[in-house]
């Protein structure tokens, strides 16, 4: 909340000063304004995903004559998308290149920035809904139109090599591979791939009685299908079997599997590329948009197979029925999988650790959050107290 509004405030101040003539960057004025609008839109959009309401701040707001009003998250997202669209107009009307340290590691062109904004509009539209009905009601044709103009390669930043907490650093990537300490992969993510009865037995127990177990996964990202000399499972391409959990906490959170995909982030001390928007996410968004708009099963299957077959080692989804948004994640063709169930499983598997909050928002929109889970967060208490407003919260049973 505070970091995002700090970014919005800085971007807004920059636009105000350029428009007022207090600052002139010559031929680079449009580059600065376009980038500032991008920052405004990205930041407001994240606030709309996370919180139930927020402020909208841009260069048109006169703080000297009044105060900002909290407005519902949908209105915040509307403003965010308008800001991203305004950035796109500037990017497409001009031909410039950003300095490589504005988005660390690459000097992005104005055309590439327009693609980035289009992809974020598609991402934000899909993730905003708080339930299944709202997710189905998304204008998926607009999502598709933005995907058609969106990213054509993975997007992210280059880590600065300065370790944890540095400027160009992602805590999501850094901590997702900390399996040797506290980071474990939840069975609700990987369990659907279990070909033994371990996961179904685990689910059948009361949460207080659940404990960690060894799966027999058919997913090559989790296990390569062979055993080491000491009988442990040899690693998959993205995960591995690890030792027993030593934490003192509820055993339903224990797991014998760790996520190893981004280990180079920590082993290099943050000196590697950090991908924040994978091309596979564009494919998953396109697949879901086709599901909602009557697209062909073969086109959907082709998109899902890019990770399901190539990374997971599963058979093609070409013969599967469409299913519905009510289908639980399931990658197994031999166990009643549908295109919908594979989409849910694949998207959560492939994008694990890529962008903070992604799986939380997906489960919310698909109606799969655990009972009692809050659907969004309240405005932070510090701001409520400053404005003299009542504290409140969400969630619980």
Residue locations for each model-derived region?
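Active/binding-pocket-proximal capping segment
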Residues: 299-314
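Active-site-proximal region of nucleotide-activated glycan assembly enzymes
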Residues: 287
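Surface-exposed intrinsically disordered loops and tails
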Residues: 236, 314-334
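Extended amphipathic coiled-coil alpha-helical segments
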Residues: 45, 284, 309-313
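Short loop/turn elements at secondary-structure junctions
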Residues: 166-168, 298, 303, 359-361, ...
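Long, intrinsically disordered, low-complexity segments
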Residues: 108-110, 123, 273, 330-397
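Structured, solvent-exposed acidic/aromatic patches
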Residues: 1-281, 292-299, 336-338, 396
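Substrate-binding/catalytic groove segments of enzymes
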Residues: 94-96, 132, 310-318, 351-354
